[in-house]
Amino acid sequence: MGQKVHPIGFRLGVIRSWDSKWYEEKNYAKWLHEDIHLREYVKEKLGQAGISRIEIERAANKVKINVHTARPGIVIGKRGAGIETIKKELQGKTDNEVYLNVVEVRKAETDAQLVAENIATQLERRIAFRRAMKKSVQTALKFGAKGIRVACSGRLGGSEMARYEWYREGRVPLHTLRADIDYGFAEAKTTYGKIGCKVWIMRGEVLPQSASARPPRSAGGARP
């Protein structure tokens, strides 16, 4: 049975960059666990803000956290009170100085993580899974996505036997490295159990830096 590699991990170093940007030898395990705890806390605290991704950068004794969100107003709060509260609580979870930066996601409809969370929320509200999936597909294509694939697995519709359902529209070439494919996963906690929601969104093609930096060949095909 064929398995699919993670689309983002597959493109790291080609057209995608890492969400944790730092290098360490001795304290690697400590910093890795610290990153996990910081991400879990931000996701739990700002669950209603539509968090797409959380980037963590480290330099010297400083930690910079970039929160990509569809609703920056919820994160910042009234006169910046919300972001200051979160910053103080994050400061208590690390020995380093914390800098918190909020980045707005312009098109939430073509962000795979936000689309997956939206489908999961609809399933928790007892909306029919086919309706939720088809609506997300149509909305993504309407806002400029080149292709989208949506998959849900679990006790769909409360059936006794779990199953796997998926829809696809447009192009979603998983093995083309230059294809800018965003991937998101979310879980819907229903009375029948958990339902997994996966979303792949093709947003276009990106030429890798290494390829774009090469000098063009002459008309005859000979190297300069």
Curated annotation (Swiss-Prot):
Any single Gene Ontology cellular-component annotation: cytosolic small ribosomal subunit
Domain of life assignment: Bacteria
KH type-2 domain mapped to chain residues: 38-106
UniProt-listed InterPro entries: KH_dom, KH_dom-like_a/b, KH_dom_type_2, KH_sf_prok-type, Ribosomal_S3_C_sf, Ribosomal_uS3_bac-typ, Ribosomal_uS3_C, Ribosomal_uS3_CS
GO BP annotations, alphabetical order: translation
GO terms for MF: mRNA binding; rRNA binding; structural constituent of ribosome
Disulfide bonds: none
Keywords: Ribonucleoprotein, Ribosomal protein, RNA-binding, rRNA-binding
Entry function: Binds the lower part of the 30S subunit head. Binds mRNA in the 70S ribosome, positioning it for translation.
NCBIfam families attached to this UniProt entry: rpsC_bact (TIGR01009)
Family: Belongs to the universal ribosomal protein uS3 family.
Subunit description: Part of the 30S ribosomal subunit. Forms a tight complex with proteins S10 and S14.
Protein name: Small ribosomal subunit protein uS3
Name of the coding gene: rpsC
